[in-house]
């Protein structure tokens, strides 16, 4: 597997781009209502700071998605710390090289990455946001708007990472 490391910073832009459409146009009024804010409240603070912080968090999400959407990482996770892997001439290194030559591109599609990004959102993001929302006495609309945003972000990011990293 040859990695194109510039893909991760590119994928990290997704939450900013999707957020502009999601919270700026599609669900702006619903979102403002569920968080108890007005448009005037949004004018306070720096948009640049919000963009930069969202980008940093997007980087964290992108790096976290790599082992989720690229199954080939499982082989290396299982063999982490095995000394034979460090020796490029060892039988293990040769076996891994053969394995990666044959199967290194299996399941490396946008569709597969988007699937795992969506599943990650449904099975980790949804429960986390829902738990907090219930304690904060937020509505189901609050959960739906925020989980929907993150599900789309993780699907797109997962697809980008799986296909092109």
Q: Where do the language-model regions lie?
A:
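Juxtamembrane/disordered regions of integral membrane proteins
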Residues: 1-165
């Amino acid at each position: 597997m040859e990695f194109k490391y510039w893909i991760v910073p590119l994928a990290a832009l997704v939450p900013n781009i999707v957020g502009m459409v999601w919270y700026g146009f599609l669900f702006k009024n619903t979102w403002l209502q569920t968080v108890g804010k007005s448009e005037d409240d949004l004018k306070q603070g720096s948009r640049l700071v919000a963009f930069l912080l969202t980008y940093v968090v997007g980087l964290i999400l992108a790096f976290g998605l790599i082992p989720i959407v690229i199954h080939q990482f499982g082989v290396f996770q299982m063999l982490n710390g095995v000394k034979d892997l460090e020796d490029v001439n060892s039988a293990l290194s040769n076996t891994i090289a053969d394995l990666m030559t044959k199967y290194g591109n299996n399941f490396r599609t946008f569709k597969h990455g988007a699937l795992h990004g969506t599943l990650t959102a449904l099975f980790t993001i949804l429960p986390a946001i829902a738990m907090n929302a219930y304690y904060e006495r937020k509505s189901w609309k609050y959960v739906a708007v925020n989980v929907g945003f993150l599900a789309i972000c993780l699907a797109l990011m997962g697809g980008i990472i799986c296909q092109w990293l």
